[in-house]
Protein backbone atom coordinates (compact mmCIF):
# COMPACT_ATOMS: atom_id res chain seq x y z
CA UNK A 1 0.00 0.00 0.00
CA UNK A 2 2.80 2.34 0.93
CA UNK A 3 4.70 1.32 -2.19
CA UNK A 4 1.76 2.23 -4.43
CA UNK A 5 1.40 5.63 -2.76
CA UNK A 6 5.11 6.30 -3.17
CA UNK A 7 4.98 5.39 -6.86
CA UNK A 8 2.02 7.70 -7.36
CA UNK A 9 3.91 10.61 -5.79
CA UNK A 10 6.90 9.94 -7.99
CA UNK A 11 4.76 9.94 -11.11
CA UNK A 12 3.19 13.24 -10.06
CA UNK A 13 6.61 14.80 -9.56
CA UNK A 14 7.76 13.58 -12.96
CA UNK A 15 4.62 14.92 -14.64
CA UNK A 16 4.97 18.27 -12.89
CA UNK A 17 8.58 18.56 -14.00
CA UNK A 18 7.67 17.74 -17.58
CA UNK A 19 4.83 20.25 -17.59
CA UNK A 20 7.05 22.99 -16.18
CA UNK A 21 9.70 22.25 -18.79
CA UNK A 22 7.12 22.39 -21.59
CA UNK A 23 5.68 25.68 -20.29
CA UNK A 24 9.14 27.17 -19.93
CA UNK A 25 10.05 26.07 -23.43
CA UNK A 26 6.88 27.62 -24.89
CA UNK A 27 7.49 30.86 -22.98
CA UNK A 28 11.08 30.99 -24.17
CA UNK A 29 9.96 30.31 -27.74
CA UNK A 30 7.45 33.15 -27.64
CA UNK A 31 10.04 35.54 -26.19
CA UNK A 32 12.54 34.45 -28.83
CA UNK A 33 9.99 35.09 -31.56
CA UNK A 34 9.36 38.53 -30.08
CA UNK A 35 13.08 39.29 -30.13
CA UNK A 36 13.40 38.04 -33.70
CA UNK A 37 10.57 40.32 -34.69
CA UNK A 38 12.31 43.26 -33.06
CA UNK A 39 15.44 42.42 -35.01
CA UNK A 40 13.51 42.60 -38.33
CA UNK A 41 12.64 38.91 -38.75
CA UNK A 42 9.23 37.98 -40.16
CA UNK A 43 6.90 36.20 -37.78
CA UNK A 44 3.25 35.22 -37.89
CA UNK A 45 2.72 35.78 -34.16
CA UNK A 46 1.30 39.06 -32.96
CA UNK A 47 3.05 41.33 -30.51
CA UNK A 48 0.70 40.12 -27.77
CA UNK A 49 2.95 37.07 -27.40
CA UNK A 50 5.57 39.39 -25.89
CA UNK A 51 3.69 39.51 -22.59
CA UNK A 52 5.14 39.95 -19.16
CA UNK A 53 4.96 36.19 -18.58
CA UNK A 54 8.38 35.91 -20.20
CA UNK A 55 10.07 38.72 -18.29
CA UNK A 56 12.08 36.19 -16.33
CA UNK A 57 13.71 34.83 -19.48
CA UNK A 58 14.64 38.25 -20.93
CA UNK A 59 17.02 40.92 -19.73
CA UNK A 60 15.89 44.47 -19.09
CA UNK A 61 17.05 45.79 -22.47
CA UNK A 62 15.14 43.22 -24.51
CA UNK A 63 12.10 43.60 -22.28
CA UNK A 64 12.17 47.36 -22.87
CA UNK A 65 12.26 46.76 -26.61
CA UNK A 66 9.21 44.51 -26.35
CA UNK A 67 7.35 47.18 -24.36
CA UNK A 68 8.23 49.81 -26.98
CA UNK A 69 6.80 47.60 -29.72
CA UNK A 70 3.59 47.12 -27.76
CA UNK A 71 3.23 50.84 -27.12
CA UNK A 72 3.93 51.67 -30.77
CA UNK A 73 1.25 49.29 -32.00
CA UNK A 74 -1.23 50.65 -29.49
CA UNK A 75 -0.53 54.17 -30.74
CA UNK A 76 -0.87 53.12 -34.37
CA UNK A 77 -4.18 51.33 -33.89
CA UNK A 78 -6.29 54.55 -33.62
CA UNK A 79 -4.52 55.93 -36.69
CA UNK A 80 -5.21 52.74 -38.61
CA UNK A 81 -8.88 52.81 -37.65
CA UNK A 82 -9.10 56.45 -38.73
CA UNK A 83 -7.53 55.61 -42.07
CA UNK A 84 -9.99 52.74 -42.52
CA UNK A 85 -12.89 55.10 -41.79
CA UNK A 86 -11.58 57.64 -44.29
CA UNK A 87 -11.23 54.89 -46.88
CA UNK A 88 -14.83 53.80 -46.29
CA UNK A 89 -16.06 57.40 -46.57
CA UNK A 90 -14.15 57.84 -49.83
CA UNK A 91 -15.71 54.67 -51.24
CA UNK A 92 -19.20 55.84 -50.27
CA UNK A 93 -18.55 59.24 -51.87
CA UNK A 94 -17.39 57.54 -55.06
CA UNK A 95 -20.55 55.44 -55.14
CA UNK A 96 -22.72 58.54 -54.70
CA UNK A 97 -20.85 60.31 -57.50
CA UNK A 98 -21.30 57.27 -59.72
CA UNK A 99 -25.09 57.49 -59.32
CA UNK A 100 -25.27 61.26 -59.92
CA UNK A 101 -26.71 62.57 -63.25
CA UNK A 102 -23.47 64.42 -64.04
CA UNK A 103 -21.49 61.21 -63.75
CA UNK A 104 -23.98 59.38 -65.95
CA UNK A 105 -23.68 62.08 -68.63
CA UNK A 106 -19.89 62.00 -68.45
CA UNK A 107 -19.95 58.20 -68.68
CA UNK A 108 -22.27 58.33 -71.68
CA UNK A 109 -20.52 61.04 -73.70
CA UNK A 110 -16.94 60.57 -72.50
CA UNK A 111 -14.48 63.38 -73.19
CA UNK A 112 -17.11 65.51 -74.90
CA UNK A 113 -18.65 66.44 -71.55
CA UNK A 114 -15.23 67.19 -70.08
CA UNK A 115 -14.45 69.54 -72.94
CA UNK A 116 -17.83 71.19 -73.47
CA UNK A 117 -19.64 70.46 -70.19
CA UNK A 118 -19.01 73.90 -68.70
CA UNK A 119 -20.09 75.62 -71.91
CA UNK A 120 -23.33 73.64 -71.98
CA UNK A 121 -24.14 74.50 -68.37
CA UNK A 122 -23.44 78.19 -69.01
CA UNK A 123 -25.53 78.07 -72.18
CA UNK A 124 -28.46 76.47 -70.35
CA UNK A 125 -28.36 79.12 -67.61
CA UNK A 126 -28.19 81.90 -70.23
CA UNK A 127 -31.15 80.35 -72.09
CA UNK A 128 -33.23 80.23 -68.92
CA UNK A 129 -32.48 83.91 -68.24
CA UNK A 130 -33.39 84.82 -71.83
CA UNK A 131 -36.68 82.91 -71.59
CA UNK A 132 -37.54 84.73 -68.37
CA UNK A 133 -36.80 88.07 -70.07
CA UNK A 134 -38.98 87.15 -73.07
CA UNK A 135 -41.87 86.21 -70.80
CA UNK A 136 -41.66 89.56 -69.01
CA UNK A 137 -41.54 91.38 -72.35
CA UNK A 138 -44.56 89.49 -73.68
CA UNK A 139 -46.48 90.31 -70.53
CA UNK A 140 -45.67 94.00 -70.93
CA UNK A 141 -46.82 93.84 -74.59
CA UNK A 142 -50.17 92.33 -73.57
CA UNK A 143 -50.64 94.97 -70.90
CA UNK A 144 -49.91 97.80 -73.32
CA UNK A 145 -52.26 96.41 -75.97
CA UNK A 146 -55.05 96.11 -73.40
CA UNK A 147 -54.48 99.71 -72.37
CA UNK A 148 -54.72 100.80 -76.02
CA UNK A 149 -57.94 98.86 -76.57
CA UNK A 150 -59.50 100.23 -73.39
CA UNK A 151 -58.54 103.76 -74.37
CA UNK A 152 -60.00 103.26 -77.85
CA UNK A 153 -63.23 101.91 -76.34
CA UNK A 154 -63.56 104.89 -74.02
CA UNK A 155 -62.88 107.26 -76.90
CA UNK A 156 -65.47 105.51 -79.00
CA UNK A 157 -67.98 105.80 -76.14
CA UNK A 158 -67.51 109.57 -76.07
CA UNK A 159 -68.25 109.85 -79.78
CA UNK A 160 -71.33 107.64 -79.69
CA UNK A 161 -73.63 110.64 -79.40
CA UNK A 162 -72.23 112.28 -82.50
CA UNK A 163 -72.38 109.07 -84.56
CA UNK A 164 -75.77 107.89 -83.39
CA UNK A 165 -77.48 109.01 -86.59
CA UNK A 166 -74.85 107.35 -88.81
CA UNK A 167 -75.15 104.13 -86.85
CA UNK A 168 -78.91 104.24 -87.17
CA UNK A 169 -78.73 104.69 -90.93
CA UNK A 170 -75.82 102.40 -91.84
CA UNK A 171 -75.90 99.74 -89.14
CA UNK A 172 -72.66 100.74 -87.44
CA UNK A 173 -70.55 99.66 -90.40
CA UNK A 174 -68.70 102.94 -90.72
CA UNK A 175 -68.02 103.17 -86.98
CA UNK A 176 -66.65 99.65 -86.84
CA UNK A 177 -64.41 100.36 -89.81
CA UNK A 178 -63.05 103.57 -88.29
CA UNK A 179 -62.49 101.97 -84.90
CA UNK A 180 -60.84 98.93 -86.48
CA UNK A 181 -58.48 101.18 -88.42
CA UNK A 182 -57.57 103.22 -85.34
CA UNK A 183 -57.04 100.19 -83.14
CA UNK A 184 -55.05 98.47 -85.88
CA UNK A 185 -52.77 101.48 -86.17
CA UNK A 186 -52.20 101.58 -82.43
CA UNK A 187 -51.49 97.86 -82.15
CA UNK A 188 -49.18 98.02 -85.16
CA UNK A 189 -47.28 100.90 -83.58
CA UNK A 190 -46.85 99.00 -80.30
CA UNK A 191 -45.73 95.79 -81.97
CA UNK A 192 -43.40 97.67 -84.29
CA UNK A 193 -41.75 99.39 -81.35
CA UNK A 194 -41.35 96.08 -79.49
CA UNK A 195 -39.90 94.32 -82.53
CA UNK A 196 -37.51 97.19 -83.16
CA UNK A 197 -36.41 97.09 -79.54
CA UNK A 198 -35.85 93.33 -79.61
CA UNK A 199 -34.24 92.84 -83.03
CA UNK A 200 -32.77 96.28 -83.83
CA UNK A 201 -31.38 96.68 -87.35
CA UNK A 202 -32.25 93.10 -88.23
CA UNK A 203 -35.87 94.14 -88.84
CA UNK A 204 -34.78 96.96 -91.15
CA UNK A 205 -32.67 94.58 -93.24
CA UNK A 206 -35.12 91.68 -93.40
CA UNK A 207 -38.47 93.39 -93.07
CA UNK A 208 -41.52 93.02 -90.89
CA UNK A 209 -43.36 89.73 -90.35
CA UNK A 210 -46.02 88.74 -92.86
CA UNK A 211 -48.80 88.77 -90.29
CA UNK A 212 -47.96 92.37 -89.40
CA UNK A 213 -47.83 93.39 -93.08
CA UNK A 214 -51.16 91.67 -93.75
CA UNK A 215 -52.73 93.49 -90.81
CA UNK A 216 -51.52 96.85 -92.07
CA UNK A 217 -52.82 96.04 -95.58
CA UNK A 218 -56.25 95.22 -94.21
CA UNK A 219 -56.34 98.47 -92.30
CA UNK A 220 -55.29 100.33 -95.47
CA UNK A 221 -58.07 98.67 -97.45
CA UNK A 222 -60.61 99.79 -94.86
CA UNK A 223 -59.25 103.33 -95.07
CA UNK A 224 -59.42 103.30 -98.88
CA UNK A 225 -62.97 101.96 -98.85
CA UNK A 226 -64.01 104.65 -96.42
CA UNK A 227 -62.44 107.47 -98.46
CA UNK A 228 -63.90 106.07 -101.72
CA UNK A 229 -67.38 105.92 -100.21
CA UNK A 230 -66.96 109.45 -98.91
CA UNK A 231 -65.86 110.68 -102.35
CA UNK A 232 -68.59 108.84 -104.23
CA UNK A 233 -71.58 109.71 -102.06
CA UNK A 234 -70.39 113.08 -100.78
CA UNK A 235 -72.52 114.62 -98.06
CA UNK A 236 -74.99 111.76 -98.27
CA UNK A 237 -72.65 109.70 -96.08
CA UNK A 238 -72.65 112.41 -93.41
Curated annotation (Swiss-Prot):
<feature type="disulfide bond">
    <location>
        <begin position="27"/>
        <end position="50"/>
    </location>
</feature>
<feature type="propeptide">
    <location>
        <begin position="177"/>
        <end position="195"/>
    </location>
</feature>
<dbReference type="GO" id="GO:0043679">
    <property type="term" value="C:axon terminus"/>
</dbReference>
<keyword id="KW-0800">Toxin</keyword>
<keyword id="KW-0964">Secreted</keyword>
<dbReference type="GO" id="GO:0007268">
    <property type="term" value="P:chemical synaptic transmission"/>
</dbReference>
<keyword id="KW-0165">Cleavage on pair of basic residues</keyword>
<dbReference type="GO" id="GO:0005886">
    <property type="term" value="C:plasma membrane"/>
</dbReference>
<dbReference type="Pfam" id="PF01160">
    <property type="entry name" value="Opiods_neuropep"/>
</dbReference>
<feature type="disulfide bond">
    <location>
        <begin position="31"/>
        <end position="54"/>
    </location>
</feature>
<dbReference type="GO" id="GO:0007600">
    <property type="term" value="P:sensory perception"/>
</dbReference>
<comment type="similarity">
    <text>Belongs to the opioid neuropeptide precursor family.</text>
</comment>
<dbReference type="GO" id="GO:0043025">
    <property type="term" value="C:neuronal cell body"/>
</dbReference>
<dbReference type="GO" id="GO:0030425">
    <property type="term" value="C:dendrite"/>
</dbReference>
<keyword id="KW-0555">Opioid peptide</keyword>
<feature type="propeptide">
    <location>
        <begin position="124"/>
        <end position="167"/>
    </location>
</feature>
<keyword id="KW-1213">G-protein coupled receptor impairing toxin</keyword>
<dbReference type="GO" id="GO:0007218">
    <property type="term" value="P:neuropeptide signaling pathway"/>
</dbReference>
<dbReference type="InterPro" id="IPR006024">
    <property type="entry name" value="Opioid_neupept"/>
</dbReference>
<keyword id="KW-0732">Signal</keyword>
<feature type="signal peptide">
    <location>
        <begin position="1"/>
        <end position="25"/>
    </location>
</feature>
<protein>
    <recommendedName>
        <fullName>Proenkephalin-A</fullName>
    </recommendedName>
</protein>
<feature type="disulfide bond">
    <location>
        <begin position="34"/>
        <end position="66"/>
    </location>
</feature>
<comment type="function">
    <text>Met-enkephalins compete with and mimic the effects of opiate drugs. They play a role in a number of physiologic functions, including pain perception and responses to stress. Enkephalin peptides found in Meiacanthus fangblennies induce physiological effects via their interaction with delta-type opioid receptors (OPRD1) (tested on M.grammistes). Therefore, finding a proenkephalin sequence in M.atrodorsalis venom suggests that this protein act in the same manner.</text>
</comment>
<feature type="region of interest" description="Disordered">
    <location>
        <begin position="76"/>
        <end position="103"/>
    </location>
</feature>
<feature type="propeptide">
    <location>
        <begin position="206"/>
        <end position="230"/>
    </location>
</feature>
<keyword id="KW-0257">Endorphin</keyword>
<keyword id="KW-1015">Disulfide bond</keyword>
<dbReference type="GO" id="GO:0001515">
    <property type="term" value="F:opioid peptide activity"/>
</dbReference>
<dbReference type="GO" id="GO:0031628">
    <property type="term" value="F:opioid receptor binding"/>
</dbReference>
<keyword id="KW-0527">Neuropeptide</keyword>
<dbReference type="GO" id="GO:0005576">
    <property type="term" value="C:extracellular region"/>
</dbReference>
<dbReference type="GO" id="GO:0090729">
    <property type="term" value="F:toxin activity"/>
</dbReference>
